[in-house]
């Protein structure tokens, strides 16, 4: 059977790590031929999707329309095959999902059931509810948060539950490909705390800066905070650092070698998120065996309850800045004393029962 993974986001957010991990899982399914439909360039091949995030507004709109048309034609011509669509709960997902649902064998891989910045919009939520209730038949679920949204949407189809796929790629870094700003962001004699990925309010960049502002001077002398990623809505400007020398801020696309460099050199990965349904940043931290310092939200609580040696969970209090500051301070004070990633937790993480169950259920569904 031909299996097509549909990823319109692609190069815009570094989705190739996830796609490659997913393909490795699908390779275990007998007689499966897998292709990723994305906007990544391959030598001698035209990309399936145009990069709808590059250029002026007219180019972006034209690319989006072209992508819709290209996908509907492809799905119609290959409707006997299987399509797996990666959704992030954005408004532009709605037509993409409707198109993919034209194939009887479709599976919606839900990264977010509705995007975090629009989950209070009743009109958009109703549109997703209509789609899940009337058109979508099969989904992949990574978290309880997604399950709750599906219940709210009256979704009655098949739910395949699985943790975020474990990354598997080379950890070697080609130093010439690493920008000087990234090389200079790490201070070897300091405790380097990394905030990585797309920067927005939901991911709590303001909570992190506020927390660092509240640390005492002794702790501040020990740390270097590296913020690396794209800031689409100027979220980083919401709170000003009390001491800008504690921060190295890189607001741009981070290439693969720079990602490896930052994760290899950092001491901790900060996750001060307000909400999330899953986190590739968390999985990347685990892949590099870097402990996380995480806010007290259900997804992180669930992960660190299962793998307690993988990081530190902040207390569950209303003042997120104070709470994260105390957790940061306690973690730095015990740096070099607390041990992380013990053998039992790591073995359980690598050989998760949920992953094996997912492979079995997915294979059975594919061959129905």
Q: Where does each model-flagged region fall?
A:
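A conserved mid-protein helix/loop that constitutes part of the nucleotide-sugar donor-binding site
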Residues: 16-21, 200-214, 283
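An aromatic- and histidine-rich active-site surface loop
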Residues: 66-67, 83-103, 277
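Membrane-proximal helix-turn-helix segments that form the acceptor-binding/catalytic region
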Residues: 72-73, 99, 121-139
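A short, active-site helix/loop in glycosyltransferases that binds the activated sugar's phosphate group
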Residues: 134-159, 166-168
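Conserved donor-binding/catalytic core segment of Leloir-type glycosyltransferases
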Residues: 183-203, 209-212
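Nucleotide-activated donor-binding/catalytic signature segment of Leloir-type glycosyltransferases, i.e.
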Residues: 236-260
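Acidic donor-binding loop of glycosyltransferase active sites
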Residues: 261-277, 290
């Amino acid at each position: 059977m031909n299996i097509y993974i549909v990823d319109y986001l692609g190069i815009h957010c570094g989705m190739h790590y996830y796609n490659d991990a997913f393909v490795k899982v699908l390779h275990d399914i007998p007689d499966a031929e897998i292709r990723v439909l994305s906007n990544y360039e391959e030598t001698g091949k035209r990309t399936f999707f145009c990069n709808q995030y590059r250029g002026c507004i007219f180019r972006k709109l034209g690319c989006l329309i072209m992508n819709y048309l290209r996908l509907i034609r492809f799905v119609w011509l290959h409707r006997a095959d299987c399509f797996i669509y990666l959704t992030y709960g954005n408004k532009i997902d709605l037509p993409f999902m409707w198109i993919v649902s034209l194939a009887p064998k479709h599976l919606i891989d839900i990264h977010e059931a509705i995007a975090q910045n629009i989950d209070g919009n009743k009109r958009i939520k109703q549109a997703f509810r209509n789609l899940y209730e009337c058109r979508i038949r099969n989904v992949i679920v990574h978290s309880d948060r997604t399950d709750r949204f599906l219940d709210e949407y009256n979704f009655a189809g098949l739910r395949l539950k699985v943790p975020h796929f474990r990354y598997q790629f080379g950890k070697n870094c080609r130093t010439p490909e690493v920008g000087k700003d990234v090389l200079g962001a790490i201070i070897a004699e300091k405790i380097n705390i990394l905030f990585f990925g797309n920067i927005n309010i939901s991911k709590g960049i303001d909570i992190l800066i506020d927390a660092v502002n509240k640390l005492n001077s002794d702790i501040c002398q020990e740390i270097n905070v590296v913020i690396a990623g794209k800031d689409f809505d100027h979220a980083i400007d919401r709170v000003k650092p009390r001491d800008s020398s504690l921060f190295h801020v890189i607001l741009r696309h981070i290439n693969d070698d720079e990602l490896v460099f930052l994760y290899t050199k950092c001491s901790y990965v900060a996750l001060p998120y307000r909400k999330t349904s899953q986190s590739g940043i968390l999985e990347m931290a685990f892949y590099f065996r870097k402990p996380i310092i995480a806010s007290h939200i259900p997804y992180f609580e669930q992960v660190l309850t299962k793998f307690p040696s993988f990081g530190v969970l902040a207390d569950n209090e209303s003042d997120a800045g104070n709470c994260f500051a105390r957790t940061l301070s306690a973690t730095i004070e015990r740096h070099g004393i607390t041990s992380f990633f013990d053998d039992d937790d790591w073995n359980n993480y690598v050989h998760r029962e949920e992953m094996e169950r997912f492979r079995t259920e997915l294979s059975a569904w594919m061959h129905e």
